[in-house]
Amino acid sequence: MKILGIGNAIVDVICKVNDDFIIQNNLTKSTMKLFFDENEFKKLISNLKIEKTVSGGSVANSIVGISQLGDKAGFIGKVSDDEFGSKYEEGLKKENVEYFYSKKKEKLPTGTCLILVTPDSERTMCTFLGTAGKINENDVSSDAIKKSEIIFLEGYLWDEGEPKKAFDKAINNANKVAMSLSDQFCVDRHKPHFLNLVQNKLDITFANEQEITSLIDAKNFDEVINFSKQLKKLVVVTRGEKGAVAINGEEVVESGIQKNLKIVDLTGAGDLFAAGFLHGYVNKLLTKECLKKGTEMSSKVIQQIGARL
């Protein structure tokens, strides 16, 4: 297998809202908030008009994109034996992704992410992890990890105790490890651990500019470049309208964005960028071509509702 993803198995519920809704519900725009009270989460959804429901989860979105590009890909994530769990499995099988988990009856429902899209196409996420947050080391197949060229992990796995053990097992058995830092607040919650991972455990780090800047307390992007050079590992940073940059030792490669796009929803931009880049990487393309592939995938997904093509 080329790439095996391990992450939160979550169904995305997409709704359009105005900025007032974000403010009234004490949410921080363009970030992800975790909900631990299922009733509070249901109350938030109850008054909204649902635009679309689709299988999601950051790494899972990337893995689907990788499969769509023709690479053999798999995913490990935990769902419950309920309506959303069945929908989740079906969504992966439809995209030819090998799913290394069988849904079971659980006390908690399948994880759900409420994605609130504001008129500027930014997305604010509210997540109830449910069963997704209970993935543990017993759910992770050592054999599948060892047979994969790269495993791809998400920082969100650190938001619950049990997934951390699954995370460690994956890293200890992997040939190569790539990870997305996931979210600026996620970085802030786990900064010392993430910094250790980036410096000592990961082969490839994916981050946006805000995440990597927060991680190292950088005052400007030159500090990000210098930090990344010293790692002598691959660091890939998306910078919004400024494009993306990949740093690997002294090699610094930049890429622009595709212009004149009709942006509808930025939800899957980072996920699909990672998909395109990793596709290029495992097929041994030059770094510049990997960035180009990432930009192409990202540009496609932001012109539609939802994080999957």
Give, region by region, the residue ranges found by the protein language model.
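Active-site nucleophile and cofactor-binding loops and adjacent substrate-binding regions
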Residues: I50-S58, K103-K107, T267-G268
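Conserved beta-alpha-beta core of the PfkB/ribokinase-like small-molecule kinase fold
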Residues: I150-I225, K242-A244
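Conserved phosphate-binding/catalytic region of the ribokinase-like
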Residues: I3-A9, C15, I23-S30, N47, ...
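A short, aliphatic-rich alpha-helical micro-motif
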Residues: A144-K146, V198-Q199, K229
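Conserved phosphate-binding/catalytic loop of the ribokinase/pfkB sugar-kinase fold
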Residues: F100-K105, I115-G161
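A glycine-rich helix N-cap at a beta->alpha junction
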Residues: G91-L108
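Glycine-rich phosphate/adenosyl-contacting loop at the front of the ribokinase-like
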Residues: M1-I76, S86
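Hydrophobic beta-strand scaffold residues
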Residues: A73, Y99, V177-A178, V235
